[in-house]
Every structure is written in C-alpha cells, then in structure tokens.
Amino acid sequence: MKPWLCLVFFTSAFLIWHAEAEFFTSIGQMTDLIYAEKDLVQSLKEYIRAEETKLSQIKSWAEKMDVLTSKSTSDPEGYLAHPVNAYKLVKRLNTDWLELENLVLQDTTNGFITNLTIQRQFFPTEEDETGAAKALMRLQDTYKLDPETLSRGNLPGTKYRSSLTVSDCFGMGKTAYNDGDYYHTVLWMEQALKQHDEGEDTTVSKVEILDYLSYAVFQFGDLHRAMELTRRLISLDSTHERAGSNLRYFEKLLEKEREKPSNKTVATTEPVVQSGAYERPLDYLPERDIYEALCRGEGVKMTPRRQKRLFCRYHDGNRNPHLLIAPFKEEDEWDSPHIVRYYDVMSDEEIEKIKQLAKPKLARATVRDPKTGVLTVASYRVSKSSWLEEDDDPVVAKVNQRMQQITGLTVKTAELLQVANYGMGGQYEPHFDFSRRPFDSTLKSEGNRLATFLNYMSDVEAGGATVFPDFGAAIWPKKGTAVFWYNLFRSGEGDYRTRHAACPVLVGCKWVSNKWFHERGNEFLRPCGRTEVD
C-alpha cells in the first residue's frame, strides 16, 4: 500500500530524533508524535477503504446469488432442465465460489499492521505515560488546581479545549497508587467516581474505582469513610472477595477503637471525612511552599521602596565599540542580588535556527549528584537539553559573541551554549548554578560558574517563571529577552541568595538557552572587591 511506503520514510526521520524516549520531558519532541499519529490515521483510513471495497464486492455477490438461488430452489428440476443452468451451477460451485472464498480470505490488514508495528517501537513508553501523569499532578499542586479544573480543561491561555474522561482520571489515580501516592490517588479516584456518577459513558466500572479509592482513604486513617466506600462497592458486587475481606478487617479495627475508653464516644459519632479533607504529605524540599507560591505570582517581595531602586537604561557594555551605536535595552529586575533583563538579545530567525540545531541533539537534562558528583537524571529536573558548539553554525558564534559584549566577560572559558526545552509540567526545582563542592574536579581548570546568562526563546502562556525563593523574586519568560546575574561574589565565594528554580510550565512550550561564564579568564574583567560579599 502506498501509505506504508510513505511511513517507512517518515519513520527513518523519527528514529533519528527519538532513539531516546522520555517524550514527556520535551514538548519540542512531543510534536513529532502528533504527525506520527496523523500518519497512522491515514494508514487506518486506507485499511478501512480496502475493507469496504472488499465487503462491497462480497455484498454484491451475495445479492446476486440470493436472487439466483431463490429462482433455482422454487423449481430445481425445471431449473436444471436447461443445460446452461446446469453448467453454470457446476461452474459456480467449482470456480466462482472458490474465487469468493479467496476474496473473503484476502488479508487487507497487512499494510496497516506493518505500519503500526514499525511505529510502535518509537511510541511513548509506560515511563512516558507515568511521567505525563505525574506532570499533571505537579501542575495540580504547584498552581492549586483541583481535579475538576484539570479534568474539564479550564486552564488559562489555552487555545484548544481538552477534557479528561473517567478512564483518564482513573489512569491518573492508578499511576499515583502505584507510586504509593495516596493523596493524589484519592483526588483522582474521587474525580473518576464523580464523572461516573454523572452518567459519563465509560468502560471503567464503579467497582474498580471504589476498590482503589477505599484503600487509599484507609491509608489516610479515615476508617469510617473507607468502610462507607467498601460497603458501596459490595452493594454493586457482592462477590468481590477483597472488598469483603477488607470490610471485615475495617470492622475489627473499628471495634478495637470503640473498646478504648477515651475513644468510646468519638468512635460512634465521628462524621465521615469529606472529599478534599486530606492534607498533602510533607515534601523533601524545605522551601516548597515559598517556591510554589512564587510560581503562582504570590509572595513576590517587590515593595514600592525596592521598586524605586530599579531602573531602565541603555547598556553599551562599558563602552564596547560594538555596542556604542546600538546599545541594548537593560532593565533592573532585582536590586540585591543584582538581576538584569536585556531586550532584543536574539532575533526570531536566530531563535528558530538555534532550536533547529538543538532538536536532533536533545537528551534528558541531568544534574550532578551532590554525593558522588556523577551526572544523573532527577525527577526535580524535567526537560531535555543539548549543547551547541560554535562550529555547529555561525549563528552560535554570533550569539556567544553578543553575550560576551553585553556582559564584558570572556566566553573562552565559558561552557558551551546549552539549549533546553521543557516538557509536560517541565521544571527545574530550586538549585544553585555554582558548585558547592570545593574539590570538584570540574573546577580545576576553568573555576566555578561565575555568572548565568539566560535567554528566553519563547513566550509561555502560563507558568514557567524563573523564581528565587530566598528573596522572593519571580521573572517571567519573554521571547527574545535575557536575564543575567552573578552566582559568585567578587571574592569567589558562592552567593547563596541565587538559589533559583524554573517553575513548571502550565500552558505552552518553553525554550531557553544559557551560557555559564567561569572564573578563569575573568580575573581582571571582574576583579576582587574589598570584602567577601562585594
């Protein structure tokens, strides 16, 4: 089939891009899945057309034979008295019915199945589905979205409306359950049950939902509600062995509670805990609440007094000859530590070229293990990144040179240009750009990361801010702009105030590129100050 030939060509390109999975970590790479699915739909249509043609031929044959046999069976001997009819009967049974048999046995599925088999090896994996579900939960927590809001697709800045079915909500709950996350299990199983009760058509049964929900509720110590849900389950399926066993166990626990003198009254009058009454478990991140509040635009400590100390100006890079005629617009984002934003740093054409160069090289972004120093993937950094060299394209050298002119620092000892694309709920939780390991082998030749130059290569419809929990700043992405700050004091000591985070992307696709300038080569470009904190 022709679609199969087209697909082989498409898949060869798909293979180059997606030798590594983890689609959920990069929206840029997930866009290819859209085209892959469209190609499969086209292949499916071809299969349907072939099946319809085949059935049409069979139907035509059946109708013709129905008329003929009605005539022949009404007077068999009279019919066969005509020698032509006798011949045609023998011919039909020996030849024509054999041809029909071959038509019926003709396999039109081969092309579609071949397509599907080829494509499937590049499909998202179980890990991708789990990662995507956790991304939605991360957005739910960070931006305080209830399951109803997410399920109905009521998100700010969205161009396309999309909703979650009972099956989708059930899948979210199962992912949380399998991860031992009973908080989100309860939230999503309750949403699945709510939509089921509203009459939504689904293949998921209430029994399945109640089975997970009752156990998750029990894990929160809500014995009364666990019993209520289990009884509801048994009323729907009295043969459910596990539910019956659980109910007997719950009743024994309740009886023990009632036998305790101090709990005698409470046990018989305690009301059923309502939906949403369960608290989110404590997190490993100490500044979680501050970080998430800043991501929502809350808790930003931009006072009128501080605002008065922030200015806009034209920046010529300390009278850099290249910038005297065309200086950059510079805006103070924060006073201490000093964070500035530059406008029109990269053109749309340069941004598209950088993205084009980066896409084939995108790989899951890593972090350095604080104990071993080894680079590894981490759940708190969800994005894909690649590194571009000046030899890759003249535009890379041009952008590097521009950052050098703006900052007055040398790029000779700086790291390669890193390009990052954030996936579903893409984020990088609070971290330092500089190394806090004094004997880090990576610091021996080039020194520590002196400064960060961060280019925003896309607008983001919602979320995706760069936040600094220590002093309460939030900087929102704006395509073509860049922000710059020093990670180290002039003494070389780390400025711990610069601990920052990339907030989860709620709606949109976030592209950034950054350059980390190192200490070596900048000793005289940014000399030591008089004190350790200059």
From Swiss-Prot:
Q: Which domain of life is it from?
A: Eukaryota
The terms under GO molecular function for this entry are: iron ion binding; L-ascorbic acid binding; procollagen-proline 4-dioxygenase activity
Q: What is its main location?
A: endoplasmic reticulum
Necessary cofactors:
Fe(2+); L-ascorbate
Catalyzed reactions per annotation: L-prolyl-[collagen] + 2-oxoglutarate + O2 = trans-4-hydroxy-L-prolyl-[collagen] + succinate + CO2
Which N-terminal stretch is annotated as signal sequence?
A: 1-21
Sequence positions that bind 2-oxoglutarate: K510
Residues annotated as glycosylated: N115, N263
- Co-factor remark: Binds 1 Fe(2+) ion per subunit.
Cellular component GO terms, alphabetical: endoplasmic reticulum; endoplasmic reticulum lumen
Q: Which UniProt keywords apply?
A: Dioxygenase, Endoplasmic reticulum, Glycoprotein, Iron, Metal-binding, Oxidoreductase, Signal, TPR repeat, Vitamin C
Domain Fe2OG dioxygenase, which positions? Answer: 413-519
Q: What is its EC number?
A: 1.14.11.2
Q: Which InterPro entries match?
A: Oxoglu/Fe-dep_dioxygenase_dom, P4HA-like, Pro_4_hyd_alph, Pro_4_hyd_alph_FE2OG_OXY, Pro_4_hyd_alph_N, TPR-like_helical_dom_sf
What the entry lists under Pfam families is as follows: 2OG-FeII_Oxy_3, P4Ha_N, TPR_P4H
Q: Which residues make up the binding site for Fe cation?
A: H431, D433, H500
Alphabetical list of Gene3D superfamilies matching this protein: 6.10.140.1460, q2cbj1_9rhob like domain, Tetratricopeptide repeat domain
SUPFAM superfamilies in the record: TPR-like
Oligomeric state and partners?
A: Heterotetramer of two alpha-2 chains and two beta chains (the beta chain is the multi-functional PDI).
- Which protein are we looking at? Prolyl 4-hydroxylase subunit alpha-2
